[in-house]
Regions:
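Generic anion/oxyanion-binding catalytic loop in active/binding sites
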Residues: 1, 38, 67
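Positively charged, low-complexity/disordered segments
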Residues: 1-9
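Single, function-defining residue in the core of a domain
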Residues: 8-56, 64, 77-85, 92-93, ...
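DNA-recognition alpha helix
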Residues: 57-71
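Active-site- or DNA-interface-adjacent structural scaffold in DNA-acting proteins
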Residues: 69-135
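Long, charge-rich C-terminal accessory regions
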Residues: 137-139
Length: 439
C-alpha cells in the first residue's frame, strides 16, 4: 500500500494538479490576473484545501493544511482565492483522477449503479434560492430545507464515483440526468447498469442497448396503473422469467390493433435512441424476471442480460450489490463531512460536493489496493472506511507518511458480514450552518 499511496499521491499532486496549474487559464475566471502573482495560496493549495475540508470552520481547515504561522493565510484571503476558481477545475480533476487506474470487473462486465441523493445545504431564505427549497410536510416547521439533488454513476466493484450531476431539488429529473450522463460516457464501457425503481424507462433501456451495454433495473412488482409490466402476458401469481420481443410504437392504427402479439403501444417522448419521427417503430427485446425475497416479498427485475448466462439467482445477487451506492452516500455525507458545508453560495457549495467525491475516490483507490488476510476467524476483513478517510485526509495535508497511513488503516479493520438487513429509518435532516463551527 505504501508504494500505491506514493504513486497515487504523485498522480494526484504532481501529474494532474501541477498540469492543471500550468494550464490554469481554462479553470479560472480571469486568466490574465488570477493566480499569476506569487501568494501564500497557490492554485494547487487552494484546491487541495477544499478537497481536505473537515467539519470545522474554514479557518481551522486552513490551519490544518498550512500549520506554519508565517505561511498561513487568513480566511478572507483564502475565500478571495477560491472565488477565482471555476467549477470546471474540480470537475476536470475528478475525471482525470479516474482515468489512469485499471478497473476490476465481474462476469467480464463493469458493474455500475446509478442513483440520486438529496444533499441538504445551508442557504438564505431568499427568492433566488426558491428552486432549491424542499417543501416540509410538518406544519410546525416554518423554515424550508434547501437541497441539491446529486445523481451519480458509481462503480460497485472498484467503489468509486464515475460521473455526477448536481441540480436543484425542485426541478430534478433522475431519468433525464441519467440519459445525459450516458451521452457523456465518463464511465468504462462494456458495463452493466443496476438501478432502483424510478429508472424503468424504455428510453433509457434503448439508449443503454444502443451503446452495447447492459441494464438490470428494478420495476414495480404489481400490475396496477403505471406499472411497466402491465399489459404484458405474464402470470399474476408466482415467479416467472420471460423474454419478450415487441415492436414498440406510439402509433395506434388497424395494424397495431390487429397484432397485439407483435406491437406494443407506449406513451413516451421522442428520443434519438428510441421512437422518433424517422423511426416510428422500434423493435426491442426485454427480459422480465419476477423473484421472491427471503421475507416473501416479490420484486420485478427488467434486464437485457442473456438467460443462459444469468439465471434469476445470479440477477438477485447482482442487484444486492447495488446497495453499495447507498453505503457510499452515507460515507461521503457523514464520514467525509459532506453535509458540513462552509459557504452559502451555490457556486462554492457545488465546488465542495465535487471536492468530496474526488477525496472519496482517492481513499477508496487506496483501500482497494490494501491486502489484508487472516488465516483464522469466521469473517473476511476490510478497512474501516471512516478511519481510512481520516488517514488519507491527513496524508493529503502532508501530516502523515505513507507508512503511518498504512499502519493506522491496518489497525482498524471491520468484518465483512454479508446478508444482513435492517429497517431503514427515515429522519429529517437539517443543514449545519457555519455559525456553529468550532475553531
Amino acid at each position: 500500500i505504501c508504494a500505491c499511496l506514493v504513486g497515487l499521491g504523485d498522480v494526484y499532486k504532481r501529474q494532474i494538479l501541477n498540469n492543471m496549474a500550468k494550464n490554469r487559464d481554462s479553470y479560472v475566471k480571469n486568466p490574465e490576473k488570477d493566480f499569476t502573482r506569487k501568494r501564500k495560496l497557490s492554485f494547487q493549495d487552494t484546491i487541495n484545501t477544499i478537497v481536505t475540508y473537515d467539519a470545522g470552520s474554514i479557518g481551522r481547515c486552513i490551519k490544518r493544511y498550512i500549520p506554519k504561522v508565517e505561511k498561513t493565510p487568513t480566511t478572507s484571503a483564502f475565500l478571495q482565492q477560491q472565488k477565482k476558481l471555476k467549477l470546471s477545475a474540480f470537475q476536470t480533476l475528478f475525471y482525470r483522477f479516474n482515468d489512469p487506474f485499471p478497473d476490476k470487473t465481474l462476469y467480464h462486465l463493469h458493474i455500475l449503479s446509478v442513483d440520486g441523493t438529496g444533499v441538504t445545504v445551508p442557504m438564505d431564505r431568499i427568492n433566488e434560492n426558491k428552486e432549491y427549497a424542499r417543501v416540509r410536510t410538518n406544519k410546525d416547521c416554518t423554515r424550508p430545507a434547501y437541497q441539491f439533488h446529486v445523481s451519480c454513476i458509481y462503480d460497485l466493484i472498484n467503489e468509486r464515483y464515475c460521473d455526477a450531476y448536481i441540480e436543484p431539488f425542485r426541478t430534478h429529473s433522475e431519468t433525464h440526468v441519467f440519459s445525459m450522463m450516458l451521452e457523456r460516457k465518463n464511465f468504462p464501457q462494456k458495463a452493466l447498469f443496476i438501478a432502483d425503481r424510478g429508472y424503468e424507462s424504455y428510453l433509457l433501456m434503448a439508449q443503454i442497448q444502443h451503446d452495447g451495454n447492459y441494464f438490470l433495473i428494478r420495476a414495480r412488482e404489481d400490475f396496477g396503473q403505471g406499472s411497466m409490466i402491465k399489459g404484458y402476458p405474464f402470470p399474476r401469481d408466482g415467479t416467472f422469467d420471460k423474454t419478450v420481443t415487441y415492436i414498440y410504437t406510439k402509433t395506434q392504427n388497424k395494424r397495431t390493433k390487429a397484432n397485439p402479439e407483435l406491437y406494443k403501444r407506449v406513451a413516451t417522448r421522442n428520443s434519438p435512441y428510441f421512437i422518433n419521427k424517422e423511426h416510428p417503430y422500434v423493435k426491442m427485446t426485454l427480459r422480465f424476471v419476477m423473484i421472491v425475497l427471503p421475507n416473501g416479498q416479490k420484486e420485478c427485475l427488467i434486464t437485457n442480460l442473456p438467460a443462459n448466462k444469468f439465471p434469476p439467482e445470479t440477477l438477485k445477487k447482482l442487484y444486492c450489490i447495488r446497495w453499495k451506492i447507498e453505503t457510499s452516500f452515507r460515507l461521503i455525507k457523514y464520514s467525509a463531512n459532506l453535509l458540513e458545508f462552509h459557504s452559502k453560495k451555490i457556486e462554492f457549495l457545488q465546488q465542495e460536493i465535487w471536492a468530496k467525491m474526488i477525496f472519496y475516490n482517492f481513499t477508496t483507490t487506496i483501500t482497494q489496493h490494501l491486502r489484508y488476510k487472516r488465516d483464522r476467524g469466521k469473517y473476511q476483513y476490510k478497512p474501516n472506511m471512516t478511519n481510512a478517510l481520516q488517514m488519507c485526509k491527513d496524508y493529503l495535508r502532508n501530516a502523515k507518511t505513507p507508512n503511518d497511513v498504512e499502519g493506522h488503516i491496518l489497525m482498524e479493520m471491520t468484518p465483512i458480514r454479508d446478508g444482513r438487513s435492517f429497517k431503514r429509518d427515515k429522519s429529517r435532516h437539517q443543514s449545519v450552518f457555519t455559525t456553529f463551527r468550532h475553531n
